[in-house]
């Protein structure tokens, strides 16, 4: 199976729980997409838009979330009912457990909502508690126009406007970034947690 066909399957395959074994098999054979811009991604590119965490704490997109950090980022919505979001979230919970006390110290995890009108800080906090998320993983909301800029700057967009409007199309990937050293890599979110950890370590410069 060629890479183009694989990416198409990862983006478009129905996300019911019964499809999980197929998706996992595809993910294990996939190669992460390395992103290395010519001039680098810094504050003037990302912008410094205001957001809020699940606790209602105001933060700035670049200064507080990205600058000087190694990060793992994905987009979601708490009201997702297509079967994919809960599986992805549990996969990322397992990733956080593998990180242990590195999460919030060496690596910071961020989940940006795709539905800010629904996902208030209080709702995000309850959702986070239900997942059993530990420290170092922030759930973020804000004004839709600001979140759309964040989504575009982070590369969670599709060239086809019709597909880009499908919020489910943006929940099946995770972006790893090392802002100080300008290393960025994207992987399918249903890749085994151990493999995702390996990608974080590569981006962080802990292994070749």
List where the protein language model places each region.
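Thiol-based oxidoreductase modules, predominantly thioredoxin-like and allied folds used
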Residues: 106-119, 136-145
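N-terminal export signals
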Residues: 5-25
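Short, internal strand/loop/helix patches
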Residues: 126-171
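Short active-site neighborhood of thiol/selenol oxidoreductases, capturing the structured segment around
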Residues: 65-85
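Conserved helix-turn-beta segment immediately C-terminal to the redox Cys motif
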Residues: 88-110
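N-proximal helix/coil linker or "cap" segments that precede and/or mark the start of modular domains
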Residues: 20-48
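Thiol-/selenol-based redox modules, centered on thioredoxin-like
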Residues: 163-208
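A short beta-strand-turn-helix
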Residues: 50-71
